[in-house]
Amino acid sequence: MLSRSIGLVIHIDTSMWITVLRKNFLADQHHQRPKGRSGDWKPPLKVAWAIGYHSAYTTQPQGQERVSTYNVAVVGATGLVGQEFLKIAAQRRFPIKGLRLLASHRSVGRKMTVGEWAIEVEEATPRSFQGIDLAIFSATTEVSRELIPAAVKAGAVCIDDSAAWRMEPDVPLVVPEVNAEDLKEHRGIISIPNCPTTPLCQTLWPVHKVNPLKRIVVDTYQSVSGTGAAAVEELTEQTRQVMEGNSAQSHVYPHQIAFNLLPQVDVFLGSGYTKEEWKVINETRKIMHEPELAVSATCVRVPVYVGHSEAVHAEFSKAISPEDFTEMVHEAPGITVQDEPSVNLYPTPWSVAGRDDTYVGRIRQDASVGQTGIAFWLVSDNLRKGAALNAIQIAEELIVRNLM
């Protein structure tokens, strides 16, 4: 599967399910060789070529080229989010000078074709970050806890997709459309929110700024790719087993996921909530700088490959109409409103897979609270806006704000 953009071509050997589910994203992609390079190949970094710079939130002066390029390490490069990061970096022409692909010892020696070079995956160790400007982490909490201090000590700015640092008081937890200003407080580590938290905050923020939230009740419907490649394979295999009349064998989840729903994402805690639900609650409060905001979440795993969906009930301080809510959300960056019930138009995971925006529909007055409540439905690609795209956007903001 080949993803193309001007100046950088990335080839990644991914499984057929991504090819199918990325139909919208890949429909207009074609094979094109790069026109040239900005530098020679110099180990230990595999040198790509300088590529243009794009930021969705900061306007760059017309005709002014950014010449700075950066040595980038991707930890968890062989995982679903790591691979998505590489594709999005190409699409958005992120200014990469050198690229180091890191993973666990199980992936050492695997080659991933980036541009004109087949880059060999190296084992991620504390010594992997010499000469690195930016390190993207998409690994376990344990790996992030172990390696990020070493990366920061080596001089890298780290953007972390795990839960390791999210609730640390001195670590910014950032959705660029919401709280990019928090980046100025970073000390070498920036956290990415959990994948259902990001689109929730992104959608509610433009309304909250003018009509403060009082309460959020959210039910999430989360795809298996949020768990990882093993869960994707399990859904595929269980579907085959059931269709052939056999019993489904579960290894990743506590119950069969094919043709089923599991009202459990992550482990249960003593409160009766799951760890995932508390992530949504606490991360939303931190991102919005509202530590007392009333939030309740129920997180459900669903037999969908890509795309997290959410049914949201939001109560505001003052009366708000569905029309006013729609207008404010529609004007916000990174949000597309799809809301035309008369023609059955609303977002679905299938239609949103491979898209950058968060899609919002089913906007209506919340009948349980009256004029101060809005109910709506949102869908986002959890591998993109829920993870890899958010990381790229944070990195873009760091560059524009001279915070690298």
Residue spans for each PLM region:
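Short, positively charged and aromatic/hydrophobic N-terminal segments
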Residues: 18, 53-57
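Residue-identity detector for glycine
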Residues: 7, 36-39, 52, 63
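Low-acidity, Ser/Thr- and Arg-rich intrinsically disordered low-complexity segments
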Residues: 3-5, 15
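N-terminal Rossmann-like NAD(P) cofactor-binding subdomain of oxidoreductases
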Residues: 63-257, 292-294, 327, 358-359, ...
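Cationic, low-complexity basic patches in intrinsically disordered or flexible, solvent-exposed regions
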Residues: 30-33, 43, 61
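Charged docking surfaces used in two-component/phosphorelay signaling
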Residues: 135, 224-404
